[in-house]
Amino acid sequence: MTVTGIIAEFNPFHYGHQYLLSQAKGLKIVAMSGNFVQRGEPALVDKWVRAQMALENGADLVVELPFLVSVQSADYFAQGAVDILMRLGIDTLAFGTEQLFDYQKLSRLYSEQAEHMTAYLATLPDHLSYPQKTQSMWEAFAGLSATGDRPNHLLALSYVKASAGKKLQLQPIKRLGAGFHSEAKDQCLSSATAIRKHIADRAFVEKSSPNAALILRAPQVTWEHYFPLLKYHILTAPDLTQFFQVNDELASRISAAIRSVATVDELVEAVATKHYTKARVRRVLTYILVKAVEAPLPEGIHVLGFSKKGQAHLKTIKASVPLISRIGAKPWDQLTQRADTVYQLGHMDMPEQTWGRVPIRPGAMN
């Protein structure tokens, strides 16, 4: 039987995600971001609610990406997620993309030319951001042309690199409906960005997600719920460079801006440059928020939920893969758990995110 892996955030789950799951083959394993997502933001609703959404729409197993995989640049995000999915026995990786290319061919190219392609990146001028350099690399070696407003395609190219040299079939699925960043309300399939933007419009959410009731019932948070705590950490930290990926220049820019801004968006605008993208700045601010430092990734894989098929699959691999189904006195990943504690502070009704939580199953949160 085909075992398909999907890397996702489901922030929140919408009809485009439902379509992606419907097109994936065989047993479907989702490696999902936890309570903070790749572009450096708190998830709108918590990871347990999002796992429930996935399971109710065809996923068989949902596992959590550790914090230092979830909140990373595209290449590290992709590599960490693919590594986890490979340990869970996938043979296919399905992903949505704005452009359908022969990604399998691109993966073979990268496995053969990785050294030359990496060397090419080093020759590009420093004023270019890493995403811009990556686009230039693919254009030079494969004739691809993509723009920065097609993030699913750029992530797909990171999946290509992460799967190079592995026995993994790539299944690109054409993204339908609104663009990734679209805030429009008049699209047949609205984006997660639009749902987050218009979350107060109940009718819009109900027409945009098969799990609207779950989304609307759950405590919802945004970056602004955490700005006072972030500001406190910035103002009281003896040295911001102690935190993950905060260099001297970023520390200086953040410290200089923090007293004159009133929101996270204003802080991001003040700190970002052509070299430091807004997404990178948001990730750095997330690291400061949760006091993240460089640490090894956990050996165990945290299971958020499963169907009967997913449970049967877990039984076939549990002897070779350390699976974490309940976090108690012994931590799974201290940094992820600290991030969960911070996340809980964003809403007074936010349920416990770690201690005593067990994998959910379809229908368990009705």
From Swiss-Prot:
Signal peptide: none annotated. SUPFAM superfamilies: Nucleotidylyl transferase (SSF52374). Pfam families: HIGH_NTase1. ATP binds at residues 7-20, 96, 152, 175. It is found in: Cytoplasm. Its EC number is 6.3.4.-. Keywords: ATP-binding, Cytoplasm, Ligase, Nucleotide-binding, RNA-binding, tRNA processing, tRNA-binding. It is an enzyme of class 6 (ligase). Transmembrane segments: none annotated. The keyword ATP-binding applies. GO terms for molecular function: ATP binding; ligase activity, forming carbon-nitrogen bonds; tRNA binding. GO terms for biological process: tRNA modification. It catalyses: cytidine(34) in elongator tRNA(Met) + acetate + ATP = N(4)-acetylcytidine(34) in elongator tRNA(Met) + AMP + diphosphate. GO terms for cellular component: cytoplasm. Belongs to the TmcAL family. Catalyzes the formation of N(4)-acetylcytidine (ac(4)C) at the wobble position of elongator tRNA(Met), using acetate and ATP as substrates. First activates an acetate ion to form acetyladenylate (Ac-AMP) and then transfers the acetyl group to tRNA to form ac(4)C34. This is tRNA(Met) cytidine acetate ligase. It comes from Streptococcus equi subsp. zooepidemicus (strain MGCS10565). The gene is tmcAL.
